[in-house]
Every structure is written in structure tokens, then in C-alpha cells.
């Protein structure tokens, strides 16, 4: 009779729920064996579910594949809402039918998985571009226009250049055909890939700014208006990376000028 360890090693090789190996092992009454069978079945089902989820997130890409297009860039940004730091956009071209396990809207990926999935995108992407527009430009042109500039910069870095753009809720004035998708980072794998690249890139920048400007908790809040950030603003004032067109930073700057 096989040991439970041997059965466990055998089950790792099973890839289908209908495998005859399950039927054979289910005759074994040992609770440890039954536990391993259940565990492996759950793992196989999870893999099937994940594959279906990834498949559903390729629907926009597959429509474009049918038209003979393969160089499809997903575009997304991170950092529209913070009081400090840049807006960062990424453009990513994935290989045809590329599925990266765990890839999703960056807001839905557990923080501890960010770097792992970011690295998987880096490893598998055909091309990646990153656009960073700082707070001074944001204050000059407004955050909406700055976001467009960041996206255009990211796209300009792609080589080869894309045949079509899938963009998260935005239209760009570029001579490339494009599709604007509401909640694109949750509905397109290409946009989701751009989402995690932009997110990790910006988070790393904000960690560097946290070293440069301690007291605002930038490493944790990424420039968003958390209680610790607002406390830092009150105690320490405005830094060179704060967006002076955003409240409450704007009022703090005006108050300082008037005093």
C-alpha cells in the first residue's frame, strides 16, 4: 500500500478533475488520503476558475486578434487623486493570448503579490513604456491633461509601436486606433498589466520621497490624504512634491502667503 506521502506526490501530477487516479484513490479509506484528494481537487478547480477569469479578461484583445492585430497596448495610470507626487502611466504590450496568473486590476491584487506580478509582467511583456508627470505640470495643466501626457509619454516609449490601444476610460489624441474601456483594468488583461506596472512604479517613487521628506508617511499612503499625511502637512508644511492646485494644500499655501 502506498504511503500518504507517495500519494501526495502522485496527486501533484493530476491535472483534471475527471482523472481515473481520483476514482482509484477514493477507494482508500484512510482519512489522510481523502484529505489529500480533496485538497488537490480544490487546487485544480481554483486553476480552472483562474483560467476562465483570465480568458474573460482577454475578450477585447481577442476581438482585435480577429482583425489581424497583435501589437495591442494596454494603457493605465495611477496617482490622479493624491495630494503629492506625480501621476504615473504605463503602456504594456503582451504577447498574443498571454495569461499571467493572478493578474488583475492592481487595486484587487493583494499588496504582498504586487512585486511578484509586476515581475511576471516584466518577464513576459513584449514592450513596456512608463510616463511620469510631476506635480508642477499637474498644477499647470490640471490632473486630467497631465494624465493624458503621462499616457502619451508611456506609449512613445514602446518598441515596436502598437497597432491598437486599449485605454482605461480615456481617449488620446494620437494617430493610433484605440478603444476606451470603462473599468478597463478589471476587464482587459493588457490594461491590468499596465495598471500593476504603473502602481508598483509609483509606489517605489513615493518610498523614495518618504526618505527625502520624512513626516508625511509617503511610503504608506503614496501621497493620498490620510490622517498622518494631513498631520504632516499641518506640522511641517508643504513640500516641493505637493500639488498646490489640490485642497487642502492650496489653502495652506495661500494662508502662508497671506500671513
From Swiss-Prot:
Primary localization: cytoplasm
Catalytic activity, EC: 3.1.26.4
Top-rank taxon: Bacteria
Cofactor: Mn(2+); Mg(2+)
GO CC entries: cytoplasm; ribonuclease H2 complex
Catalytic activity: Endonucleolytic cleavage to 5'-phosphomonoester
Residue ranges occupied by any RNase H type-2 domain in the UniProt entry: 70-258
Binding, a divalent metal cation: 76-77, 168
MF terms (GO), sorted A to Z: manganese ion binding; RNA binding; RNA-DNA hybrid ribonuclease activity
Record InterPro entries: RNase_HII (IPR022898), RNase_HII/HIII (IPR001352), RNase_HII/HIII_dom (IPR024567), RNaseH-like_sf (IPR012337), RNaseH_sf (IPR036397)
Keyword Cytoplasm in annotation: yes
Any GO BP annotation: DNA replication, removal of RNA primer
Keywords annotated in UniProt: Cytoplasm, Endonuclease, Hydrolase, Manganese, Metal-binding, Nuclease
Gene3D superfamilies: Ribonuclease H-like superfamily/Ribonuclease H
Stored SUPFAM superfamilies: Ribonuclease H-like
Cofactor: binding comment: Manganese or magnesium. Binds 1 divalent metal ion per monomer in the absence of substrate. May bind a second metal ion after substrate binding.
Subcellular location field: Cytoplasm
NCBIfam families hit by this protein: PRK00015.1-1 (NF000594), PRK00015.1-3 (NF000595)
Similarity comment: family membership: Belongs to the RNase HII family.
HAMAP family associated with the record: RNase_HII_B
Role summary: Endonuclease that specifically degrades the RNA of RNA-DNA hybrids.
Official protein name in the record: Ribonuclease HII
Species, as recorded: Streptococcus pneumoniae (strain Taiwan19F-14)
Encoding gene, per UniProt annotation: rnhB
Amino acid at each position: 500500500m502506498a504511503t500518504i506521502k507517495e500519494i501526495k506526490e502522485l496527486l501533484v501530477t493530476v491535472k483534471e478533475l475527471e482523472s481515473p487516479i481520483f476514482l482509484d484513490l477514493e477507494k482508500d479509506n484512510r482519512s489522510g488520503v481523502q484529505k489529500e484528494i480533496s485538497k488537490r481537487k480544490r487546487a485544480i478547480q481554483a486553476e480552472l476558475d483562474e483560467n476562465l477569469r483570465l480568458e474573460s479578461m482577454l475578450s477585447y484583445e481577442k476581438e482585435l486578434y480577429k482583425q489581424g492585430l497583435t501589437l495591442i497596448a494596454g494603457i493605465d495610470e495611477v496617482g490622479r487623486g493624491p495630494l503629492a507626487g506625480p501621476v504615473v502611466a504605463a503602456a504594456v504590450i503582451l504577447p498574443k493570448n498571454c495569461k499571467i496568473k493572478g493578474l488583475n486590476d492592481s487595486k484587487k491584487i493583494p499588496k504582498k503579490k504586487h512585486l511578484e506580478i509586476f515581475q511576471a509582467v516584466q518577464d513576459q511583456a513584449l514592450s513596456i513604456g512608463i510616463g511620469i508627470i510631476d506635480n508642477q505640470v499637474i498644477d499647470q495643466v490640471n490632473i486630467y491633461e497631465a494624465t493624458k501626457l503621462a499616457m502619451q509619454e508611456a506609449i512613445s516609449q514602446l518598441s515596436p509601436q502598437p497597432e491598437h490601444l486599449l485605454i482605461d476610460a480615456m481617449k488620446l489624441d494620437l494617430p493610433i486606433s484605440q478603444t476606451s474601456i470603462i473599468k478597463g483594468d478589471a476587464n482587459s488583461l493588457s490594461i491590468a498589466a499596465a495598471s500593476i506596472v504603473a502602481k508598483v512604479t509609483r509606489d517605489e517613487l513615493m518610498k523614495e520621497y518618504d526618505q527625502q521628506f520624512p513626516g508625511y508617511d509617503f511610503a504608506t499612503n503614496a501621497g493620498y490624504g490620510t490622517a498622518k499625511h494631513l498631520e504632516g502637512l499641518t506640522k511641517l508644511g508643504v513640500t516641493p512634491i505637493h500639488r498646490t492646485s489640490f485642497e487642502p494644500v492650496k489653502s495652506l499655501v495661500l494662508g502662508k502667503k497671506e500671513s
